[in-house]
Amino acid sequence: MKKRFVIFAMAAAMALNLAACGGNGSGNSGDSAQSAASGEASSKYKISVCLKTLSAEYWTFVKAGCDQAGIDLGVSVDVKGPTSETAFDEQQNMIETDLNSGYDAFIISPLQADTVATLIAGETKPVIALDTDVDAPEVLTFVGTGNEAAAAMGAKAAVEAAKEAGWTDITAICLSGVQGDGTATARFNGYKSGVEEAGGTFLADETQYADAVADKAVNSMEAIMQNHPEGIAIICCNNDDMAIAAARAAKGNSAYEKTVFLGFNGDKQACEAILADELTMSVAQEAYSMGYMSVEKAVAALKGEKLEDFTDSGCDIVTKENAQERLDTLNGYLGK
């Protein structure tokens, strides 16, 4: 990906002038973060955020980060998302509407990166990719996790956990997300390399695609148990919802009693499941920071600052040793 430079000082000045004249109207979903910090409300930048969905816990933390950044930075942030991560047309319609609704900048978590690249072609206002990158010159930075590296780190930890659990034949199967999705592909590649580098065997040909949802993960796990009655050491999952569902589906099967179930996101329910011995571990994304940083970068772009190609929001491995600490942190983000 080539270096992206932000040259939006003139556009930012024009946006401010338009706002002062009351000509920067936009459709607002009612989920905006407002600030009383400085200036008149009409002079605020208005930033559109379109996530992959708002129906999963992970995305509520991304939204919370976006909203808080809007408050702290004195900008209006309008967060929305489709009903599910397979509602492709719904997200496309949201993005198309927002591109023509007077926003000053756009933050997008694409369900289909190629489609989004087409939608934003020629856009002169700042565009930030969040969680999943978009290969387009209009995108100024990608804010998110290095998914492949993070998944590899998690897979290596899972291999060690499998050895500690008594497995001698370290085999792993992936419950992946939406087939063709860039994030799912990166995590798959990371899981594969991590398992193999740690000395395990990754059964790539037996990958199950479960569209990133729990109910399909149950079906996938049932298929794995039918195909492998002897048990599998590691089940690498695209997200925590899938990992928890797969672990519950395997409960009661003695061949899978010591299977390591690896999730991805490190959200609240994952921490609770780990503490309850219902999930082994999770690769934790910093969803709140990801949302917050994406708004920070959008504002920086509007001020004419130069952005790096990739803004790493960080990651960690959640196990029983640190799950409670992380749970407390996540509850703090939501004011609980």
Can you name each region flagged by the protein language model?
Residues 3-24:
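Sec-dependent N-terminal signal peptides of Gram-positive bacterial secreted proteins and lipoproteins
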Residues 18-37:
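Bacterial lipoprotein signal-peptidase II cleavage site
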Residues 43, 175-179, 183, 194-198, ...:
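Hinge/cleft segment of the Venus flytrap/periplasmic-binding protein
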Residues 46-65, 69, 73, 78-92, ...:
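Extracytoplasmic "Venus flytrap"
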Residues 47, 91, 143-170, 214-218, ...:
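Hydrophobic alpha-helical segments within soluble ligand-binding/sensing domains
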Residues 58-75, 150-157, 182-202, 216, ...:
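Short, solvent-exposed amphipathic alpha-helices that sit
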Residues 96-100, 104-127, 191, 206, ...:
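Hydrophobic alpha-helical
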Residues 113-149, 171, 265-275, 279-280, ...:
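Flexible loop/hinge segments that line or gate small-molecule binding clefts
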